[in-house]
Amino acid sequence: MPATPSQFIWYGLCSSNPAKAAEFYGAVLGWTVQGSGPTEMNYKAWLAGGEGIGGLLEITPDMALGGMEDGWLGYVDVEDVDASVATIVAKGGHSHMAQTVPGVGRMAMVSDPQGAAFYVMKPEPTDAGPSPAFAPRVLGHGGWNELHTKDSNAASVFYRELLGWTSDASYGMSAMGAYLTFNVGGDAISAIFNSPGFPKPRWLYYFNVDDIDAAKARVEAAGGTINAGPMPVPTGQWMLNATDPQGAMFGLLGDKA
């Protein structure tokens, strides 16, 4: 998997019904799924325009008993997974599991001090070039990464210190406070803000579409639910967030026709 330091390099969906998930995201985003991964788990890759941008993992009964729910998890490229995990734990976060997959890389599922889960990963090979997973305005790829949390100031400090993200801009959001955006290497990649309407802190990942209204209609026709939007954003685009038929939240980002 190609590397892009401190960037989101993969988007993984844990699903209680992978076949239904593949059908839904295929209808909404045009994705296809490919094969099974290098492990014994039922794992497939999401392809957008023929490029791998994420994975689809089946939630087994044992995983469900352990508390795993349908949802998306982003993978962030780090130089040293174990050192990053130690830093996360020292700062009040948690480590849930770590593994090394030959030919893919070392990774660990973690959560920040407020409970938002994500992965840190050191991909292999290390000279494969930039990951295509996050590619603003490229259809079907990740277009934005948004942390809904309870203390945006504390979360901002945590991610800046862990990943070296730098502040990009701040937008007022009335009662929710500031919408803080961050960049890596000069490229805007994420935002952090207080979101009291969410049941618990989580990352929400937005994928690019050509027409936000047409995409909204596809979500609804395929059995998904629109939670908010479409709403305009400073880039001139529009975004919405939604829930797939199995309960996983995601976002879409695009223009209006």
Each model region followed by its residue ranges:
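Vicinal oxygen chelate
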Residues: 1-4, 7-16, 44-46, 62-87, 89-143, 147, ...
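Glycine-rich acetyl-CoA-binding "A-motif" of GNAT/NAT acetyltransferases
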Residues: 52, 70, 117, 188, ...
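Short beta-strand micro-motifs enriched in acidic
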Residues: 34-36, 59, 195
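Conserved donor-binding loop and adjoining core beta-sheet/short helix segment
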Residues: 38, 48-50, 56-68
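Core segments of cupin and vicinal oxygen chelate
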Residues: 2-52, 90, 98-105, 109, ...
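Short amphipathic beta-strand/extended segments with alternating polar/hydrophobic composition
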Residues: 54-57, 190-194
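DNA polymerase sliding clamps and clamp-related checkpoint/processivity subunits
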Residues: 55-61, 65, 74, 78, ...
